[in-house]
Amino acid sequence: MELWPGAGTLLLLLFLLLLLLLPTLWFCSPSAKYFFKMAFYNGWILFLAVLAIPVCAVRGRNVENMKILRLMLLHIKYLYGIRVEVRGAHHFPPSQPYVVVSNHQSSLDLLGMMEVLPGRCVPIAKRELLWAGSAGLACWLAGVIFIDRKRTGDAISVMSEVAQTLLTQDVRVWVFPEGTRNHNGSMLPFKRGAFHLAVQAQVPIVPIVMSSYQDFYCKKERRFTSGRCQVRVLPPVPTEGLKPDDVPALADRVRHSMLTVFREISTDGRGGGDYLKKPGGVGEAGL
């Protein structure tokens, strides 16, 4: 007579215990709910990328494949109860290349980006994303431009090539000039690569501001609920006649206008507002 259950029975009991535990954690632990939601968010994107790859592969690496990725990702906001409001979309130049610069708060920026992404527009992303499984391959097929931020020389070379691509292939690029995600509810100093790119190509800069997520999402507090995000497209900033020496002032001017709008459209649903008052400025030259 066996005193202990077999391995199969033990695994079944553990599985049943997990099924009972998950709903308890979901309703009783905001932190657990946060991790579940983020795990599903990332996992769902990887799954959608698997579905997109065969469709995108028909064209090969092509900026038009970004339309396929956008179509497949637009529904995610509904799964999380996030309402995305777009204002100022008429500011996009109708028939010329340009550089989009946007603030960068978290991976949820993808929702706002897909909502407002103009035609023939691709992001510039860090090279590490290229190795992110199915998502990396789907991004490559969609024409996403990858740069190695640790190798400044290579990044500058890529930017020079991008400037030529903008003009010869009628492409727009989307850049996060903060260079990394910013969770403090303000804006980090801007790196100047996007502005050098726009000046080199003599194309306009289109600033896009996404309101703070603090009322429904906070990584530090492990909080992720439903909420509203406003995406504001600002009037294009011309660069005709500007030279490399004008880049610092240009970056400072664009950041100031974006920060002003960010403070205007952002609200703290829990009654605070101090997170919008943190100082910052334009960073040293770099990418």
Curated annotation (Swiss-Prot):
GO biological process, one term: CDP-diacylglycerol biosynthetic process
Topological relation to the membrane, as annotated: Multi-pass membrane protein
Keywords: Acyltransferase, Endoplasmic reticulum, Lipid biosynthesis, Lipid metabolism, Membrane, Phospholipid biosynthesis, Phospholipid metabolism, Signal, Transferase, Transmembrane, Transmembrane helix
Involved pathway(s): Phospholipid metabolism; CDP-diacylglycerol biosynthesis; CDP-diacylglycerol from sn-glycerol 3-phosphate: step 2/3
Transmembrane segments: 38-58, 128-148
Range of residues in the leader sequence: 1-26
GO molecular function, one term: 1-acylglycerol-3-phosphate O-acyltransferase activity
Catalysis: reaction(s): a 1-acyl-sn-glycero-3-phosphate + an acyl-CoA = a 1,2-diacyl-sn-glycero-3-phosphate + CoA; 1-(9Z-octadecenoyl)-sn-glycero-3-phosphate + (9Z)-octadecenoyl-CoA = 1,2-di-(9Z-octadecenoyl)-sn-glycero-3-phosphate + CoA; 1-(9Z-octadecenoyl)-sn-glycero-3-phosphate + hexadecanoyl-CoA = 1-(9Z)-octadecenoyl-2-hexadecanoyl-sn-glycero-3-phosphate + CoA; heptadecanoyl-CoA + 1-(9Z-octadecenoyl)-sn-glycero-3-phosphate = 1-(9Z)-octadecenoyl-2-heptadecanoyl-sn-glycero-3-phosphate + CoA
Motif annotated as HXXXXD motif, chain positions: 104-109
EC number, UniProt record: 2.3.1.51
Chief localization: endoplasmic reticulum
InterPro entries: AGP_acyltrans, Plipid/glycerol_acylTrfase
Any one Pfam family match given in the protein's UniProt record, by short name: Acyltransferase
Residue intervals annotated with topology Lumenal: 27-37, 149-287
Top-level enzyme category: transferase
Single GO cellular component term: endoplasmic reticulum membrane
Motif stretch (EGTR motif): 178-181
Chain segments annotated as coiled-coil in the UniProt record: none
Subcellular localization, as worded in the UniProt entry: Endoplasmic reticulum membrane
Membrane side Cytoplasmic: residue ranges: 59-127
Function: Converts 1-acyl-sn-glycerol-3-phosphate (lysophosphatidic acid or LPA) into 1,2-diacyl-sn-glycerol-3-phosphate (phosphatidic acid or PA) by incorporating an acyl moiety at the sn-2 position of the glycerol backbone.
Record-stated family: Belongs to the 1-acyl-sn-glycerol-3-phosphate acyltransferase family.
Domain notes: The HXXXXD motif is essential for acyltransferase activity and may constitute the binding site for the phosphate moiety of the glycerol-3-phosphate.
Protein name: 1-acyl-sn-glycerol-3-phosphate acyltransferase alpha
Gene name of the record: AGPAT1
